[in-house]
Amino acid sequence: MKVSRYDYTSKCVSLLLLSILFPLHLYAQTNTVELKVVDADNGNGIEAATVQWKPIGAPSFKNGALTNRRGIVQIQAKGVDSYVVLTRYVGYETAIDTLKSSIKKYTIRLRANARELDGVVVTGKSKVQFMRESPEAITVINGKDLQGRSVSLETILDKTIGLKVGQTGGLGSSSRIIVHGLEGNRIQILWDGIPMSISDGTFSLDEIPIDIIERIEVYKSIIPARFGCDGLGGAVNIVTKEFSTDYLDASYELGSYQTHKGSVFSRKNFPKSGILLGAGGYYTSAKNDYSFRVPERENLLVKRDHDRFRSYMLKGKVAFTKLWFDEISTEFGYYNRFNEIQGVLKNIQHAENKSGMFMLENKLIKSGMLNDRLNFESHFSLSHTTNNFVDTARVNHDFEGNIYPSPNGQGETGDVPHNSNDKGLEINERINLDYKLSTNHSLNLNTLINYAQRQPNDDIASQHAGFIIGGFPSKKTSIVSGLTWEAKLFGRKLTNMFSAKYFHLHSEIEDLTSYEMIEAPKKKSNTTSQIGWIEAMKYEPFRGFHLKVSYQRAIRLPNSQELFGDGIITFPAAGLKPEKSHNFNLGFLIDKNDVLGLSRLQFEVNGFYMQVSDMIKLMKQHMAAGYVNAEKVHIKGIETELKLDISPTVYAYGNLTYQDVRDVLDYLPGTQAPNPTKGLRLPNIPYLFANFGAEYHSDRLFKNWYVKAFWDGKFTEEFFYFWELTELQKRRIPRSFVNDIGLLLTYKNKYSIALECHNLMNKEVWDQFRQPLAGRTFHLKFRYVFSKGIL
């Protein structure tokens, strides 16, 4: 009988699988027990909990391990019928369980220790504390400190050491994050470790509901390879909450200038089937109609009467947790945004922008493979965006109330009218592998593949200009892959992290050779590859003192907006090169309990130095602008922060940042003409700023009530908003000092009300590009939480 090629191949594959699985089956006969440590209230796995075990009757616990990020640890109890398991974690009561050796899986539920949670300082380290003590220059903001507050994410970030948020207006306005003197696209924004596409202005951070945040990680002058992304100045990783139990979180906020924010997030768990369903969304709107003095005409006070903003997002999720994978989940959502265009130097009354985005995400997680050594995670995301910018008015306005015909026939914002219909597609696939070599050595491999394409269309603009002004269909593919080796040496006093990163970019752009004439577009391609690396060390000579040093050869690939343009005022730029930087950090962290009469003292100092080349800059070209590699910058600075738990109920903090960002380019791009701005500070980047505040909090002032009252102050020194080449050019943003106060009341961990006043003294504040910000504002927020433990 003749054996087909298919049968032969099937037998070979079967034998191969048998040879692999049979030894694993034999190994599985050994007495290995999987323990999962969870929060008794919400069912979430607890990472870094200490688990120790011993045979019944043994005098002491000699074996121990820490749970992984999902709260799981595997132990081996050989030669005994029963054994005792001791589980501890800071803020929770110690659990003691007696197990029979026949048990293969067991869940340990830890209950919160009420005394410890009331402010009494305890020994041990939380997830936030573990991260703060990592070798990277990092600041971690605990989401628990933000819950229930009537404040935006941008406001929280703006008070962080080493970080500044440049704003242009009220809710929904464009903003940029500045870390160690680098800003905008050079700072990566991540959502649960996945890069967010917000550089095109489709989405703004101040829309994100603060109550869904678990923590915020701010990496400064360094971007860990485990994120698989590029960037120069650092990264902000927003980590959201995950709950394994049923919950409902609903809030509504009312603020000045007709600001409204509402959000609802829910989750339903079916523990027997391992199915988890989630749904939620938010809505934000604001009129932003505050008054301001027109720059360069400061005796003219006008009202922002064309700055209305509205957005909403709807999301749904289904997850399976009892399959071979620890989690298989699919998440889908839709985002919609509308905003009017407010003029500052010019009175714009008709231009507006509408955009939408459909999102799909899929996640696969498997941990504990290869004898609890290998963890795997795959994250796939797809987003499809549409954008419609409308500027077709035939009349223009000035701030004195005069109306006159548009100088260009149509339009208010530029040289040509617009009615765009742009479409974009972006696909990401991230694969992350963690492998534990030994107790003190581990490897991490992370690869992020990104594909983006853009299809612009603006017939009105093209007809008016005489050529295709919105650009042509374009696409790009990028790959960022990083391998990290982490070693803990000398009794775990020294932690060393070394990473190598590979960057690859290929773009295909249809563009015109010259915008001065009508011609057929030509396809231009650009391919580049770069290597970067990171070396970071932390040394802890004694408990509570950490010395950190790090270096990164940083690379940032041009993003979609820079390569493709925006179809409105920015042309494509096919020949862009990656930005490059040498980043250095040196600092120390002190964290001590019960010292100098204080419950806790935290003090840190960090110095940084960076050499940046091939910086991408927007430059004017004919009727629009395009991005070019045109800047070279050196940055040096220092930051320091002091946090004091004066008592279990009183807390105070203060931080100060100084950063000197200088242009060091010798000649103007493409010429031998001397650069007139060499040696000058870059405009729109504050060089000296500070934050400080105090807080009182207690859950014993009134029965069943948690009370928090706080004051925050923010100081920013005067800085330039444009180059000052002569003494006569006073292009400066004045010094500012702003105070915020607030009160938060929470009843039985379910109902909360927050009242806040921002800019208490109603100071006049200007920000980047001399944009006027709102004066005193009031905010009132109500929140209801169904699930205990969500706060």
Residue ranges and their predicted role:
Residues 38-42, 49-54, 86-92, 103-147, ...:
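Short, acidic, small-residue-rich periplasmic hinge/interaction motif at the N-terminus
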Residues 138, 154-195:
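Extracytoplasmic beta-strand/coil segments of soluble accessory domains associated
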Residues 194-221:
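Short acidic/polar hinge/loop motifs at secondary-structure boundaries
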Residues 217, 224-225, 235, 241-269, ...:
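Short strand-turn segments of transmembrane beta-barrel domains in outer membranes
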Residues 245, 253, 270-351:
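Periplasmic-side early beta-strands and strand-to-turn transitions of outer-membrane beta-barrels
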Residues 273, 286, 377-379, 540, ...:
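Membrane-embedded beta-barrel scaffold of Gram-negative outer-membrane proteins
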Residues 319-336, 355-517, 522-543, 550-552, ...:
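Face-selective signature of the C-terminal outer-membrane beta-barrel domain
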Residues 493, 503-505, 600-611, 628-720:
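Gram-negative outer-membrane beta-barrel transporters
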